[in-house]
A protein has these predicted regions:
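N-terminal membrane-targeting hydrophobic helices
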Residues: 1-136
């Protein structure tokens, strides 16, 4: 999915839960991509593939549990991790899929991975989530 779809979906869902934490959720929703970008330029991940180590579900779920367990002091961390989890789910809806763990190169898809990046279905999903959340 494109960054705007990740942003719309995470911001909308976080607005229903904790509106004040929307910036953390948006930062988390875009984190797999900007962490990968930073890693390719400044860390020893120069040969990292897209949707690799920064895109695995297990790491984001562990971070979410840590953020949730320490509440109320760590709710921003939970929102950040929620954004990362939502990023994974959105990417898993696409044809390319996303990895469950950092040690596996297998990419999982949800519902057959039918979405194409930037396509009409992706935009419809992002707008649909946003409108449903706005209605709540």
């Amino acid at each position: 999915m494109r960054w705007i779809s990740h942003t719309m979906i995470s911001a909308s869902l976080c607005a229903v839960w904790q509106p004040a934490l929307m910036p953390a959720a948006v930062l988390g929703a875009t984190a797999p991509d900007w962490l990968e970008w930073l890693g390719r330029r400044h860390l020893p991940l120069a040969h990292a593939v897209h949707r690799g180590r920064t895109h695995n579900l297990l790491a984001w779920l562990l971070l979410l549990v840590l953020g949730w367990a320490g509440q109320p002091n760590t709710l921003a961390l939970a929102a950040f991790a929620l954004g990362g989890v939502l990023h994974w789910f959105c990417d898993a809806l696409t044809v390319t899929g996303a990895p469950l763990t950092w040690w596996s190169q297998h990419r999982s898809t949800l519902f057959g991975g039918r979405l194409r990046q930037g396509g009409k279905t992706e935009r419809a999903l992002a707008w649909g989530v946003m409108l449903c959340c706005a209605a709540l």
